[in-house]
């Protein structure tokens, strides 16, 4: 039997890690030889989740082609967000809830993408469709992913399907959604001990009409916890622009209590962000009123504006 590695995107978040673990558990129950791995360091929220449900973190890998010939992707499909040597392996399956871009294969594959708030919402359906029982630990991880990606159902990405899935998983995991959810989000929003690099850890790269764009996001309970370190943040952002040849680096600082964000923009295409939102950056900073979702409120809007 051919071994498969399953993983989410670089700079992994809670959905990416928990989806990889959950997908692997589903496939193992069906007899597959599969291992969940990760492409980057864990953030504080994900660490809290794994500790809470006593789950083991997936193994960190730098490349995959040196280990296997087949992989499965969760929570992403765009090649620049995936393993560096993704073109050297065969992608046999994708389970995702994002746009499809910069992705093609030579052979047919299992591809499941749905416009829901979280990958594990889709995975819950797959467990049920295949009549595979979900353990308390895996249910807790899947629930945590939904809470994380939907900001406890406050994000515009959240659907009724996500809410129903969360309720079902909470019963199995034996937790109160609101109590656990706030505890989890606050653990992830504590930036007091984070390095500048860790503040920018949740970053994704996109190709927008030939422009190289990176968008980072962090959730906080007080934006000043990040803005007080703005000079350090901007210095690292500027270095990333130079090192990666970025046209735009946008950092979205989201207040999970007010559901608003502050944007910091570095790069030659900052004017595109200004046009997209009708704002003006002053010293690289501007308010993003009501913006909490990179997937739904940032990426599509910037993609459309770059295409003009």
UniProtKB/Swiss-Prot annotation:
Signal peptide: none
Alphabetical keyword list: Cytoplasm, Hydrolase, Manganese, Metal-binding
Cellular component terms per the entry's GO annotation: cytoplasm
Cofactor, how bound (note): Binds 2 manganese ions per subunit.
Subcellular location: Cytoplasm
Superkingdom of the source species: Bacteria
Major localization listed first in the record, in broad terms: cytoplasm
List of residues binding Mn(2+) 2: 15, 75, 97, 149
SMART domains per record: DHHA2
Entry's EC annotation: 3.6.1.1
Keyword Glycoprotein on entry: no
Residues binding Mn(2+) 1, per UniProt: 9, 13, 75
MF annotations from Gene Ontology: inorganic diphosphate phosphatase activity; manganese ion binding
A Pfam family that the UniProt record links to this protein: DHHA2
PANTHER family attached to this UniProt entry: BNIP - RELATED, MANGANESE-DEPENDENT INORGANIC PYROPHOSPHATASE-RELATED
NCBIfam families xrefs: PRK05427.1
Family membership: Belongs to the PPase class C family.
Name of the featured protein: Probable manganese-dependent inorganic pyrophosphatase
Species assigned in the record: Listeria welshimeri serovar 6b (strain ATCC 35897 / DSM 20650 / CCUG 15529 / CIP 8149 / NCTC 11857 / SLCC 5334 / V8)
Taxonomic classification: Bacteria, Bacillati, Bacillota, Bacilli, Bacillales
């Amino acid at each position: 039997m051919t071994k498969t590695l399953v993983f989410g995107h670089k700079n992994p978040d809670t959905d990416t890690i928990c989806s990889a673990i959950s997908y692997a558990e589903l496939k193992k129950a069906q007899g597959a030889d599969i291992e969940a791995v990760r492409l980057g360091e864990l953030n504080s929220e994900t660490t809290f989740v794994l500790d809470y449900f006593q789950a083991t973190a997936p193994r960190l890998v730098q490349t995959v082609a040196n280990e296997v010939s087949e992989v499965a992707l969760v929570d992403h499909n765009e090649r620049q967000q995936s393993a560096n040597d993704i073109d050297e392996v065969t992608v046999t399956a994708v389970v995702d809830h994002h746009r499809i871009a910069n992705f093609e294969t030579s052979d047919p594959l299992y591809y499941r993408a749905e416009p829901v708030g979280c990958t594990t919402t889709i995975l819950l359906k797959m467990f049920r469709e295949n009549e595979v029982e979900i353990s308390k630990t895996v249910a807790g991880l899947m629930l945590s992913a939904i809470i994380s990606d939907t900001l406890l159902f406050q994000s515009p990405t959240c659907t009724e399907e996500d809410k129903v899935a969360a309720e079902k998983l909470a019963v199995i995991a034996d937790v109160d959604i609101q109590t656990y959810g706030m505890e989890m989000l606050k653990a992830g929003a504590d930036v007091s001990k984070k390095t500048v690099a860790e503040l920018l850890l949740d970053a994704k790269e996109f190709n927008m009409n030939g422009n190289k764009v990176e968008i980072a996001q962090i959730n906080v309970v007080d934006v000043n916890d990040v803005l007080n370190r703005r000079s350090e943040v901007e210095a690292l952002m500027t270095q990333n622009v130079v090192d990666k040849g970025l046209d735009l680096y946008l950092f979205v600082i989201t207040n999970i209590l007010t559901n608003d964000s502050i944007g910091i923009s570095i790069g030659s295409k900052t004017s595109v962000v200004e046009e997209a939102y009708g704002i003006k950056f002053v010293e690289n900073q501007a308010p993003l009123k009501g913006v909490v979702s990179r997937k739904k409120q940032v990426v599509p809007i910037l993609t459309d504006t770059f295409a003009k």
